[in-house]
From Swiss-Prot:
Organism from which the protein derives: Mus musculus (Mouse)
Tissue: Liver.
PANTHER family cross-referenced by the UniProt entry: APOLIPOPROTEIN, APOLIPOPROTEIN A-V
Family: Belongs to the apolipoprotein A1/A4/E family.
Gene Ontology cellular-component annotations: chylomicron; cytosol; early endosome; Golgi apparatus; high-density lipoprotein particle; late endosome; very-low-density lipoprotein particle
Biological processes per GO annotation: acylglycerol homeostasis; cholesterol homeostasis; lipid transport; lipoprotein metabolic process; positive regulation of fatty acid biosynthetic process; positive regulation of triglyceride catabolic process; positive regulation of very-low-density lipoprotein particle remodeling; tissue regeneration
Keyword terms: Chylomicron, Coiled coil, Endosome, Golgi apparatus, HDL, Lipid transport, Phosphoprotein, Secreted, Signal, Transport, VLDL
Subunit structure: Interacts with GPIHBP1. Interacts with SORL1; this interaction leads to APOA5 internalization and sorting either to lysosomes and degradation, or to the trans-Golgi network.
Protein name as catalogued: Apolipoprotein A-V
Signal peptide feature range: 1-20
InterPro entries to which the protein is assigned, alphabetical: ApoA_E (IPR000074), Apolipoprotein_A1/A4/E (IPR050163)
Induction: Induced in early phase of liver regeneration.
Gene3D superfamilies, per database record: Apolipoprotein (1.20.120.20)
Reported modifications of this chain: Phosphorylated by FAM20C in the extracellular medium.
Length: 368
């Protein structure tokens, strides 16, 4: 609860002087605290409340009173100044005190969630390593099965045009058969990867729940979104590998057809050229597929880093605390900030409700 309040308010301190910062301030000042807590969080970004300045000031003062215990014993939160600029400056001062007290707590939460997500990355590594190994084995198998340079090949070519055409026809059949066979070999690997993602992400849900700053409902949504994204990317990777094999088959088949046309016109068939074509096409398949698997691994890193920031935001001093606001994408950055704030209001509302239930179930703690 303390972490999400600090993170939400510290955003105001970070974005407090440019036009983008003014827009962020407007987000707070146009949404009353009481309605933000009790209403549906997903509607906050869409409401355009036109309350009076006095009402907004009253809400901000109430908010600082709620932060009183976080500022330390013996310190009463002062009332806000009676002008907008004074409010900004005073809030920044208050935030400095609150943030300094909660910085270690937020850093610890961020690190704990990060450790759990690193565990997920390590659990998924064997699946991608297995895929890489299978690509290498498949290339070796195709290289062996499509080999055309040998004593028997040379003898067959010396026999004349008919023998050369028979060799090319056999080569065409082998290309079709073995590429289709390799395509089938990749299906179990894709299924294991998808199943592994679902299993390990659910394990992540259980392990990260005690450390996440998010409400249980938002935690569940974040985890489900992560599972959906990684599953879709895994299926896309499998589709890409199948497409690479189709391309390999089509390119080799096209080269063989050209060679067949030449042989029918009386051109001599060079087995060395055919062998070199096979080698180059297989190398291209291996190179492209390795890059796609590496891109999938990088996507896992990016998605898990994003969910770490969603579930346990870094402390304000962290370099990744707030997104960069460039001139070209300021609207996009502000949209991301508004989305984050909507999430934070939901977490704050849950935290207050949870504290209310705790007080009701513990009368002594409430009276003391």
């Amino acid at each position: 609860m303390a972490a999400v309040i600090t993170w939400a308010l510290a955003l105001l301190a970070v974005f407090a002087s440019t036009q983008a910062r003014k827009s962020l301030w407007d987000y707070f000042s146009q949404n009353s605290w009481s309605k933000g807590v009790m209403g549906q969080p997903q509607k906050l970004a869409q409401e355009n409340l036109k309350g009076s300045f006095e009402q907004d000031l009253y809400n901000m003062n109430n908010y600082l009173e709620k932060l009183g215990p976080l500022r330390g014993p013996g310190k009463e939160p002062p009332l806000l100044a009676q002008d907008p600029e004074g409010i900004r400056k005073q809030l920044q001062q208050e935030l400095g005190e609150v943030s300094s007290r909660l910085e270690p707590y937020m850093a610890a939460k961020h690190q704990q969630v990060g450790w759990n997500l690193e565990g997920l990355r390590q659990q998924l590594k064997p699946y991608t390593a297995e895929l890489m190994e299978q690509v290498g084995l498949s290339v070796q198998e195709l290289q062996e099965q499509l080999r055309v340079v040998g004593e028997d090949t040379k003898a067959q070519l010396l026999g004349g045009v008919d023998e050369a055409l028979n060799l090319l026809q056999d080569m065409q059949s082998r290309v079709l058969h073995h590429t289709d066979r390799v395509k089938e070999l990749f299906h179990p690997y894709a299924e294991r990867l998808v199943t592994g993602i679902g299993h390990h992400v659910q394990e992540l849900h259980r392990s990260v729940a005690p450390h996440a700053a998010a409400s249980p409902a938002r935690l569940s949504r974040c985890v489900q979104t992560l599972s959906h994204k990684l599953t879709r990317k895994a299926k896309d990777l499998h589709t890409s590998i199948q497409r690479n094999l189709d391309q390999l088959r089509d390119e080799l088949s096209a080269f063989i057809r050209v060679s067949t046309d030449g042989a029918e016109d009386g051109d001599s068939l060079d087995p060395q050229a055919l062998s070199e074509e096979v080698r180059q096409r297989l190398q291209a398949f291996r190179h492209d597929t390795y890059l796609q698997i590496a891109a999938f691994t990088q996507a896992i890193d990016q998605e898990t880093e994003e969910i770490q920031h969603q579930l346990a935001p870094p402390p304000p001093s962290h370099s990744a605390f707030a997104p960069e606001l460039g001139h070209s994408d300021s609207n996009k950055a502000l949209s991301r900030l508004q989305s984050r704030l909507d999430d934070l209001w939901e977490d704050i509302a849950y935290g207050l409700q949870d504290q209310g239930h705790s007080h009701l179930s513990d009368p002594e703690g409430h009276s003391g």
